[in-house]
Regions:
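Catalytic-domain carbohydrate-binding cleft regions of carbohydrate-active enzymes
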Residues: 1-377
Length: 378
């Protein structure tokens, strides 16, 4: 809450601080507005001006552990929340998930997105062949412009400081260190920037924004006249790539390489109780409760709002550090509680729908006949 408070003040106070990207997800804004509902208009104004970039996801999920339906619901919810606040996201920012499924371009294009930005999943062979920018095609032919974040989403974090993350409060950034970092980032991408532009990220997990960024960029620009430094947005960068006329190589299939950033595949089997609870929760929602609400007609439609809340709770368990079981115990205790709530809601809705269907079928208790109502939902 304090971070977004300060961010709104900075963006309103300093027009030279061009923009801020809020991590590709909207769940944090839901939490913020629950505490600061009076700031909604301020957020909407900055979003519409293109200075606060939000979405497209509700949360940044793992790509393999949630079901395909859950990934779609996640993106749909994030897009809806973004549009409510004045945004129209077109770029699939998913920086830190541990590898990516082959059908991600299909999901993105199906919901109107044009690009995908990622950090983990490129192999050495793919790096040599594809570089930082390429086209990614799903099995149905859907394609997205795809951007590989070679040094992750923190390559320019804590710019001007000796490390990329840490507590630098009270420490003045040094312009020469900013120049050194920027030069190193560009050198690492030599020969791999087909559009002629690199995207670098000034941020990291749990790191505050840098109010002095415009001053650091101005100083670096003076020291690096051979390049043009722009404080930009993801959308602006993708506009440049797609209008550059660069011929981009094509990739088909999963992204599961480990060349610069490991996919940490062992997380797919850590805390297996979470994986089992997730599978059951998804099955109850997708295969049992939702089909029954359709069959139950008007009564089912009355119950649909309960399932929307169940989906919200389930999606809050799908950030990669949650569902992958690689966070602290306190986080996963919350995950367990949400899974229980999802199961309770889904089973209650399913039970009520079965009762409604039995009533419609004329099932009556007459003391001499036992009725068995069997329903196949998947």
């Amino acid at each position: 809450v304090e971070l977004i408070d300060g961010l709104l003040e900075l963006l309103e106070r300093d027009p030279d601080f061009q923009s801020f990207t809020l991590d590709g997800q909207t769940a944090a804004l839901e939490d913020y507005l629950a505490i600061r509902p009076h700031n909604r208009a301020r957020i909407e104004k900055l979003v519409r001006a293109g200075r606060l970039e939000i979405g497209p996801w509700f949360v940044l999920p793992d790509a393999f552990l949630p079901s395909g339906e859950a990934l779609i619901r996640n993106l749909r919810r994030g897009l809806a929340r973004s549009r409510e606040l004045g945004a129209n996201p077109r770029d699939g920012y998913m920086p830190d998930s541990f590898g990516h499924i082959a059908q991600m371009p299909l999901i993105l294009r199906g919901l109107g997105l044009r690009s995908f930005l990622f950090m983990r999943g490129l192999s050495k062979e793919q790096w040599e062949r594809l570089g930082c920018e390429f086209r990614w095609r799903a099995s149905d032919g859907s394609e997205v412009t795809t951007i590989y974040l070679r040094d992750g989403y923190l390559d320019s974090a804590a710019l001007g400081h000796p490390e990329q993350f840490g507590d630098f409060e009270g420490h003045e950034p040094k312009p020469e260190l900013a120049v050194e970092r920027l030069r190193a980032s560009l050198k690492a991408r030599e020969g791999k920037l087909h559009s002629g532009a690199a995207i670098l990220f000034n941020g990291c997990d749990h790191m505050p924004f840098q109010p002095e960024l415009p001053r650091l960029l101005a100083g670096a620009q003076a020291a690096m006249p051979e390049v043009e430094l722009v404080h930009a947005t993801i959308a602006g960068y993708i506009d440049h790539v797609e209008s550059s006329g660069a011929k981009l190589a094509l990739h088909e299939g999963e992204l599961l390489g480990n060349e610069h950033n490991p996919i940490l595949s062992s997380v797919w089997s850590t805390r297996t109780y979470l994986k089992l609870a997730n599978h059951r929760a998804q099955w109850l929602l997708e295969r049992v409760a939702e089909p029954l609400t359709v069959a139950a007609g008007a009564r089912g439609r009355e119950l649909a709002a309960l399932l929307d809340e169940a989906w919200r709770l389930l999606l809050l368990n799908h950030p990669h550090d949650d569902i992958c079981g690689c966070s602290i115990d306190a986080v996963h205790l919350d995950d367990e509680a949400r899974f229980r709530e999802v199961e309770q809601i889904a089973t209650s809705v399913a039970d009520e729908c079965v009762r409604e269907l039995a009533r419609k079928a004329g099932v009556r208790r007459d003391g001499s006949t036992q009725w068995l109502c069997a329903l196949r939902t998947s």
